Amino acid sequence: MTKGKKILAHAVLILASFLSVFPLYYMLCGATNTSIDIVRGKLIPGTYLVENFKSLVANQNLGLAMANSFRNAILMTLITLLVCSIAGYGFEIYHDKAKDSLMSVLLLAMMLPFVAIMIPLFKMMSHWGLVNSWAAFVLPSISTPFMIMLFRQASRSFPNDIIEAARLDGLSELGIFFRMFVPIMRSTYGAAMTVTFMNAWNSYLWPKIVFQSNASITMPMLVANLKSGYSVDYGMLMLGVLICTLPTAIIFLCLQKSFANGITGAVK
């Protein structure tokens, strides 16, 4: 690579980094300033963080929203990883005549937008009496086609010789999965956990539909409630967005290596 191309590449990377970091910096500045300072375009962190936090706690049930969001995200992550990893493993390891047909159905399901099945899903949840429960939030997403495809792709690198040796030693199929497949596929589980947790935490439309009581409020719903029809406290709103963003940012930073390895198909 010539010197000019290196300079151009670094310039593009610097610009991309700035465009990625600036919204976070602006959000941090907004969380520490008053609404007047934000409207005036102040780009220096202020001293109103505590005041904005007191206003947020006084106007919204922050603790309840955080607890509900963590509960929903953790439950969805655990159940989705279990179901999708077993399904992906089964699609690749076991051979059956109906496997190709089922895979075609799975691929077709990936093409359906959520809004196309949202009303039927809500009617099902209402018929089963699950509205306003965590089950209504978790059940429609436990068999995500993308996650099944991810684990199926990862299963292709799982050596068949190990499976046959384990069977000869008398290990059950569930034993092979939990004692051999799961430890080897740590990177894939890390990537799947990151994506699932972030999707569950940031979900707004479906929780807004199935959670119809104030006791079931989540963090995205709380942030939406900070905007009234007549006035907006931008400092409090920015702080709410910042608090809502922190858990997913921490999860991604902790699992970024596993995320990269899992998405690219690395097995360690």
Descriptions of predicted regions:
Residues M1-K3:
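Short, Lys/Arg-rich, polar N-terminal cytosolic tail immediately upstream
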Residues K5-K268:
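A structural signal for multi-pass alpha-helical bundles of membrane permease subunits
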